[in-house]
């Protein structure tokens, strides 16, 4: 492990390092009140159960709503009980984008804002990009100050909105954070941290003054370390990120700016998602190229490396990875959620990494986020499952409490995945009990969400890697998963072995 230090004095943002706030014109976001607009938002979108999830004790239950096209990330506000969702459709010029506010419990529409057009947008040849907006991608809520921070990836910058009205507070200058991706808020220190997917920097902003401070540097350059997702433990001031360009993670002390690199297994390719567990010091990493979830200790010791789906193929029938993209830690229920873009699934893991349930997430699941109270939110970027709308799903998942087992499904029905005890010694998804966050109170196995259909999983051959943030229109995806579950029939002296079949 190597240590790269940035002095505390540097973090204090001297005149030589700080980026001055300039009076450059800041376009005002349009808060939309018209009955319809170009955002494509369905204000009355129906809320339905996620296919295959069941409201049974010990299982993951989910609801979803096709809110708008081009969904990218979510962020939860505890004080408002609102969910903020970003939307950006297509490739440059991105003319359709919005910041959407939903009720966090019901997913009902509350409000949305449409970013203004960027009048200076140009393509690689210097030609004007007419209609290009300050499209929003990454998102985080500062509840202390009542603001929402977003990344404008196409313009390499960030913006700040009012959390209640969604009016623009500040649009930062363009080209200050190369390919700005994730943003997290450190309310205790009045800081916002923004990852730069095309550099080896973490941009730092003062949230009390809305000014940019000195960057945090990780690695030698973008080829050595390109920061993707961010995971912050505010209590200890620990910021964790992962590199898409190398098999590394990094643990950053935000007080000093020092970054300690953590080596990952050599097979890890195009890592993008990261979640940090401060209680154990473990880091959870989702990697698109290798299609796996890797669990490592702070020193790089590998706890587990789990392929999240097999049998995934592109439209030409070629084998591809699951496209494990983002990861979230549910610290309330001791579970880890991973979005698998190519497989069209969300896999639920225990804290050791073993798969406990596979959920049909729709096509191209993109982001997953924990709200701190036992719920996990996700979005996809592939429209509806049946193709009836281009609007993507916002989904909310939670573990159903209770100890009563659900009825074993008919073996001829759609495949389901069972839970096992996250505290168990074996990293085997065929174990027979689940602990809902307490090792002393296991609950009997129940049957959770059905895996999406298809013995072979089709994804479009021209799918765009998420790091490019271009979106795509991929063919319907799914996964082929076999799970054996030893059921509660053991109590009757017999063992019921259920073989989950491949099905469409």
Regions found by a protein language model. Give the residues of each.
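Beta-strand-rich domains and repeat architectures in extracellular enzymes and scaffolds
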Residues: 63-97
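Short glycine/acidic-enriched loop and turn motifs that connect beta-strands
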Residues: 88-93, 154-156, 199-201, 246-247, ...
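Short loop/turn segments that connect beta-strands within beta-propeller blades
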Residues: 103-107, 162-166, 206-210, 253-257, ...
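A short beta-strand motif characteristic of beta-propeller blades
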Residues: 57-66, 108-129, 167-173, 211-220, ...
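Blade-level signature of beta-propeller repeat domains, shared across WD40, Kelch, NHL, RCC1
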Residues: 363-423
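Beta-rich, blade/repeat-based domains predominating
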Residues: 68-80, 118-142, 175-187, 219-238, ...
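A cross-kingdom C-terminal cell-surface attachment/processing module
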Residues: 479-501
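C-terminal low-complexity, Ser/Thr- and acidic/Pro-rich disordered "stalk" regions positioned immediately N-terminal
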Residues: 400-475
């Amino acid at each position: 492990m190597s240590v790269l230090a940035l002095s505390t004095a540097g973090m204090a943002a001297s005149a030589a390092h700080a980026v001055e706030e300039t009076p450059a014109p800041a376009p005002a976001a349009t808060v939309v009140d018209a009955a319809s607009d170009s955002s494509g938002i369905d204000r009355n979108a129906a809320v339905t159960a996620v296919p295959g999830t069941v409201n049974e004790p010990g299982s993951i239950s989910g609801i979803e709503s096709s809110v708008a096209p081009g969904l990218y990330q979510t962020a939860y506000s505890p004080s408002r009980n609102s969910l903020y969702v970003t939307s950006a459709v297509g490739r440059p010029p991105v003319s359709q984008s919005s910041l959407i506010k939903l009720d966090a419990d019901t997913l009902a529409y509350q409000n949305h804002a449409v970013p203004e057009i960027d009048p200076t947008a140009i393509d690689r040849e210097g030609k004007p990009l007419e209609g290009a907006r300050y499209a929003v991608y990454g998102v985080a809520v500062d509840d202390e100050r009542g603001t929402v921070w977003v990344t404008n990836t196409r313009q390499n910058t960030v913006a700040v909105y009012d959390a209640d009205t969604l009016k623009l507070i500040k649009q930062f200058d363009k080209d200050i954070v190369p390919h700005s991706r994730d943003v997290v808020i450190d309310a205790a220190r009045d800081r916002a941290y923004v990852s730069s997917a095309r550099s080896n920097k973490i941009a730092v902003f003062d949230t009390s003054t809305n000014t940019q401070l000195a960057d945090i540097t990780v690695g030698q350059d973008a080829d050595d370390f390109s920061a993707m997702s961010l995971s912050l433990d505010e209590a200890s001031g620990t910021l964790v990120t992962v590199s898409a360009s190398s098999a590394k993670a990094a643990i950053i002390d935000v007080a000093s700016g020092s970054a300690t690199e953590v080596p990952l297994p050599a097979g890890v390719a195009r890592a993008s998602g990261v979640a940090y567990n401060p209680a154990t010091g473990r880091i959870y990493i989702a990697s698109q190229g290798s299609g796996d979830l890797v669990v490592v200790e702070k020193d790089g010791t590998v706890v587990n490396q789990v392929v999240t789906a097999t049998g995934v193929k592109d439209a030409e029938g070629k084998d591809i990875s699951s496209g494990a993209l983002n990861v979230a830690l549910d610290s309330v229920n001791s579970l880890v959620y991973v979005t698998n873009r190519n497989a069209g699934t969300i896999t639920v893991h225990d804290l050791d990494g073993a798969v406990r349930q596979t959920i049909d997430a729709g096509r191209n699941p993109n982001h997953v986020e924990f709200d701190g109270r036992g719920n996990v939110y996700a979005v996809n970027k592939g429209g509806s499952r049946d193709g009836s709308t281009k609007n993507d799903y916002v989904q909310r998942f939670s573990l159903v409490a209770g100890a009563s087992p659900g009825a074993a499904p008919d073996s001829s029905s759609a495949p389901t995945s069972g839970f096992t005890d996250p505290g168990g010694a074996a990293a085997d998804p065929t174990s027979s009990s689940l602990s809902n966050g307490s090792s002393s109170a296991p609950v009997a196995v129940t049957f959770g969400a059905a895996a999406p259909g298809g013995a072979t999983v089709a994804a479009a051959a021209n799918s765009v890697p998420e790091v490019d943030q271009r979106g795509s229109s991929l063919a319907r995806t799914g996964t082929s998963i076999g799970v054996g579950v030893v059921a509660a029939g053991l109590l009757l002296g017999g063992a019921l072995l259920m073989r989950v079949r491949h099905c469409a």
